[in-house]
Design a protein with these regions (language model features):
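Short, cationic-aromatic polyanion-contact patches
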Residues: 135-136, 183-208
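Short acidic, hydrophobic short linear motifs in intrinsically disordered regions
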Residues: 139, 143, 148-161
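Basic amphipathic alpha-helical segments that dock to polyanions
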Residues: 146, 168-179, 193
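Short hinge/loop at the helix->beta-strand junction immediately C-terminal to the helix-turn-helix recognition helix
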Residues: 151, 180-183
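Phosphate/pyrophosphate-binding active-site loops
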Residues: 1-118, 122
Length: 214
């Protein structure tokens, strides 16, 4: 192995040891680990994506996120000049800009996530008013599934609700009649449905996360 390759292995090992520290505030630790990974640049390609994935992995490891992915990397890339300037400052010994950038991106991401939650709650409330079936019915229980899985087929409905696949049609039909579900294949068999209100909310969430600052 070349001297450069051996040195890269040692430096990455040092980064891993640093990332396991427990005496540094998690968000600061994550920001510095990310910047150090980008400075090492260990791979011929994909360092940026891997470095941003490291942020998500460390956030999960330190309990800052649990069941969701917070789009911090998208927040960093909203202002690419600020992000690259922060990485450059880190290489020259100043950690403050990258810590500030990661903290700001996390704050933006959390705000974006809260907007998504509010949008989905509004959708769920409108469904409850539009669906006439009784509480606890399979059709009502399907509403909770649709917030997690806005595109479904018969197998999905049967598995999620624990019902016979032959009963899927009568479960889905009230939601179709209420304008909640839409069948989009046009097939008589192997049909699939989607919830436009949920996919629209998710699209808006993604658009906000990807929006660049001028």
């Amino acid at each position: 192995e070349s001297t450069a390759a051996i040195l890269a292995i040692l430096i990455v090992g040092d980064l891993v040891a640093f990332a396991r520290r427990t005496d540094v505030a998690p968000l600061i630790l994550i920001a510095v680990a990310h910047a150090q990974f980008e400075a090492i640049h260990p791979f011929p390609d994909g360092n940026g994506r891997t470095g941003r994935a490291l942020i998500q992995s460390m956030m999960r490891h330190y309990g800052l996120t649990t069941n969701v992915t917070v789009p911090v990397s998208a927040g960093l890339l909203q202002n690419t000049q600020r992000y690259f300037d922060a990485l450059d400052a880190y290489r020259h010994g100043d950690v403050t800009p990258i810590v500030s950038a990661v903290a700001g991106a996390a704050q933006v991401a959390v705000g974006n996530g809260r907007l998504l939650v509010a949008d989905l709650r509004g959708v769920a409330d409108s469904w409850a008013a539009r669906l006439p079936s009784r509480q606890g019915s399979a059709s009502r229980r399907l509403l909770d599934v649709l917030l997690r899985r806005p595109v479904i087929d018969s197998d999905t409905v049967a598995a999620e609700l624990g019902i016979n696949i032959g009963n899927v049609g009568r479960t889905v039909q009230p939601l179709v009649e209420a304008g909640i579900l839409r069948e989009f294949t046009g097939f008589n068999r192997n049909r699939m449905w989607h919830v436009k209100e949920v996919t629209d909310a998710l699209d808006a969430f993604a658009d906000r996360a990807a929006r660049r600052l001028s």
